[in-house]
């Protein structure tokens, strides 16, 4: 028997499974497009709903007529009976009105939460299956050299075409029936609501009486880390109903403080003075302390529930329906408020946009070298990033005209731009090498370096897709800002290492939805309902984590779990709506 015969059968088995999955998903997604009467039926349904609403309105009018109390004297017994009948009719009318309101709301407010969860599950499942097939088929290359390797390469190319076809169908599905417009409206409504609440909290009428939480920006780390430190402070201030006082004088990046770069976090209350002051000792213990000083998250004890990755209980259903990663969306709202630029910075961004020729379509690539490599992250050559850049441009080409394949390259390695241009002449690289020089360790804590990192983050967040390492705070900040620019940009990235995380976050848990029996010593068993503490995604179809019920750590198929959304009882700041 030829050495690759068994392997080839295995490849055909994978192909069959993949084809079956595509046929099943694609059949469901394109069925409507194959039916020429679909639009007509949908229009008929809408007209029928309008007719029902018209009839229901007439029913209510007649009910209102019957509720009119007749003029003139009536007997007491008859009056009592009439009142009881009126009460029953009023109750029935109230129930019907609520039902009609709900029906009307469903008719105009877009698709249901379950539809959106399912859409994202299909998208994620297809991606995870693709990671798996890529990984497993690539392994077969080493079993033989000639014909097998050629077949494997062809399989990967063909499967890539099919995967992009499914992803394109999913994109168009997400825009059908007014769903795209609904997402835009809902994202704006939620953002406006949260920003009003934050603004209310940060601008008390009487600063001398306001409860305050003091946060010092000078944590011993870089800009992205310091920004996340302030976000952590802000989230706890919001949860404990305290105005955030940001101490930023003698900031390592700008000695004039935060307000010289971004707008003040408050217009009415920047004074930390109060009748009593104390260090954080827990929300309940600090109840009667007016001014509380917060430590860095590493030293926080006791830990309140307001840390990421929790989301507000009162917004959770809307966020789950709207966004693929509600926890990131929630973090992004605090980032949005904090980084409102001063006029000079806004002008600097506009001028840099014109100078660099930044325009769409463009993919953002962030390559972190210097201090991260060898300590917090592994070295990744430019080729690893460009694989995912090319894949996404091929996907974009399915739904738009690509005039040029532009890449915004942000890096702290000044030599990388020329290397990238030499290796990939078919791409247009947009980059400011002076920023790379200023990002070096010897120049890092300067105002010029601050300007550079802010510009890099801005352009990365503006890109159509982001390829980076989530071990880098700069990359995660760009991803967070990206969420404020789109209704749902949760899938607009590929990380070469970590999944998204927030330093100091509470446990990141997933919920098993399918059983799994380990096939080797590296894997762990799953049963539906098991809670898995996720450590990371290997981007090959498998994730690593701990089964909290069994206490076992290992690998498991990524598609067999879903995110466990943690909700937190945050204050709702009803006063902000008055």
Swiss-Prot record:
Q: Where is this region: Important for donor substrate binding?
A: 368-369
What does the record give as the reaction this protein catalyses? N(4)-{beta-D-GlcNAc-(1->2)-alpha-D-Man-(1->3)-[beta-D-GlcNAc-(1->2)-alpha-D-Man-(1->6)]-beta-D-Man-(1->4)-beta-D-GlcNAc-(1->4)-beta-D-GlcNAc}-L-asparaginyl-[protein] + GDP-beta-L-fucose = an N(4)-{beta-D-GlcNAc-(1->2)-alpha-D-Man-(1->3)-[beta-D-GlcNAc-(1->2)-alpha-D-Man-(1->6)]-beta-D-Man-(1->4)-beta-D-GlcNAc-(1->4)-[alpha-L-Fuc-(1->6)]-beta-D-GlcNAc}-L-asparaginyl-[protein] + GDP + H(+)
For the biological process aspect of GO, one term held by this record is: protein N-linked glycosylation via asparagine
The family database entries (PROSITE patterns) matched by this protein are listed as:
GT23 (PS51659), SH3 (PS50002)
Which cysteines share a disulfide bond? 207-269, 215-233, 221-225, 468-475
The answer to keyword Acyltransferase applying to this record is no
Q: Mind telling me what this protein is named?
A: Alpha-(1,6)-fucosyltransferase
Q: What is its main location?
A: Golgi
Task: Pull the Cytoplasmic topological domain ranges from the record.
Answer: 1-9
